[in-house]
Amino acid sequence: MKLSKRIENLPPYLFVQISKKIAEKRAKGEDVISFAIGDPDLPTPKHILAELCKAAEDPSNHRYPETEGLPVLRKAMAEWYQKRFGVKLNPDTEVLPLIGSKEGIGHAAWCFLDPGDIALVPNPAYPVYAISSQLAGAEVFNLPLNKGNNFLPNLEAIPQNILSKAKVLWINYPNNPTGAVAGLSFFQEVANFAAKHNLAVCHDGPYSEIAFDGYKPVSFLEADGAKDVGIEFHSLSKSYNMTGWRIGMAVGNAKMIDALRRFKSNLDSGIPQAIQLMAIAALNGSQEIINQNCAIYQRRRDRLVEALRNIGMEVTAPKASLYIWAPVPESYTSASFATELLDKTGVVVTPGTGYGTAGEGYIRLSLTVPDEQIEKGIAKLAGYKKSS
């Protein structure tokens, strides 16, 4: 059987490879501490689970849901955006529930790109931005993110011959993998740039509720004219510890939202209604879980940053997100240092090159590791310093 060229050319997904390597080590009886994957270890709050259990008992929730989601869910999403960011959204035309934001990100490329178009994609970045663009037949032009520019793309450096074919601009703040943040002035620059060059902006903002030291991330949609040029993807996964329930949202430009809705209606059957109802409980209920999460992640961030500095790494503590972006020691590549840490200590980190060529020289560590495992990992890192 011959597979399609798009599948033959599709690289293995980064985190599948990492999970496989961890499983192989553990199958051999090795003690492995993984800081590789950003999947919250904290439980979904009980009041949210209670709504799920209640909804699951109702036979009306056992049938096909609608692609566009329950009106009451779209209303809850719009009201949450109004309260959190001061952004007004029409729940009927500017809000679309998603089966996790990754699903919407993957589908967006098919809505806004034709073969031969160019997608402007940060590098390093969450791999799905580039992969989905390539699957849709578009070319990817990388926008390097580097420390010298606070891991923000230099939009004015994009060549005119690229801009003439570019249709989509991807941005993501608080950023994965760098942990960088962007203020309203940057988002305003993006909105103005997109309007000038007729670009559709896709902002991925799932980490807006994971921030430290009193910092409060803003939404791209707070910028003047942002809704005229783009949409924002958000997720309940990180905010409410709901990665396993698969629910997120796309909000913003009505034309883009309608395109995504039409595409999805031909490919999926929507989000199970019981999960939609638990999402309403999350959005409308107490938001104290967000403060509790941030306090836990900040404590873990501080412990890990200290441990990395103790083995000689020059690490900047992130203001937000679930990740520490750490430069590797001189004479190492991202991959060689990650491999040495795994072989010598049993600590798993993600090589920066897993997020693009501009990730060379860095590793990423996730804060979604139980405290006990964090301390074990720190002890292993201390042992690495003694042996090196």
From Swiss-Prot:
GO terms under biological process: lysine biosynthetic process via diaminopimelate, diaminopimelate-aminotransferase pathway
What terms describe the molecular function in GO for this protein?
Answer: L,L-diaminopimelate aminotransferase activity; pyridoxal phosphate binding
Its cofactor is: pyridoxal 5'-phosphate
Residues bound to pyridoxal 5'-phosphate = S101, K102, Y126, N176, Y207, S235, L236, S237, R246
Query: Could you tell me which residues carry N6-(pyridoxal phosphate)lysine?
Result: K238
Q: Which Gene3D superfamilies match?
A: Aspartate Aminotransferase, domain 1 (3.90.1150.10), Type I PLP-dependent aspartate aminotransferase-like (Major domain) (3.40.640.10)
E.C. no: 2.6.1.83
Q: Which reaction does it catalyse?
A: (2S,6S)-2,6-diaminopimelate + 2-oxoglutarate = (S)-2,3,4,5-tetrahydrodipicolinate + L-glutamate + H2O + H(+)
According to its UniProt record, this protein's enzyme class is transferase
Keywords of the record: Aminotransferase, Pyridoxal phosphate, Transferase
Domain of life of the native organism: Bacteria
Which residues bind substrate per the record? Y13, G38, K102, Y126, N176, R364
Pathway stated in the Swiss-Prot or TrEMBL entry: Amino-acid biosynthesis; L-lysine biosynthesis via DAP pathway; LL-2,6-diaminopimelate from (S)-tetrahydrodipicolinate (aminotransferase route): step 1/1
Pfam families with a match to the protein in the record: Aminotran_1_2
Family stated for the protein in its record: Belongs to the class-I pyridoxal-phosphate-dependent aminotransferase family. LL-diaminopimelate aminotransferase subfamily.
Could you give the subunit structure recorded for this chain?
Homodimer.
Q: What does this protein do?
A: Involved in the synthesis of meso-diaminopimelate (m-DAP or DL-DAP), required for both lysine and peptidoglycan biosynthesis. Catalyzes the direct conversion of tetrahydrodipicolinate to LL-diaminopimelate.
Q: What is this protein called?
A: LL-diaminopimelate aminotransferase
Recorded source organism is: Dehalococcoides mccartyi (strain ATCC BAA-2100 / JCM 16839 / KCTC 5957 / BAV1)
Q: Which gene encodes it?
A: dapL
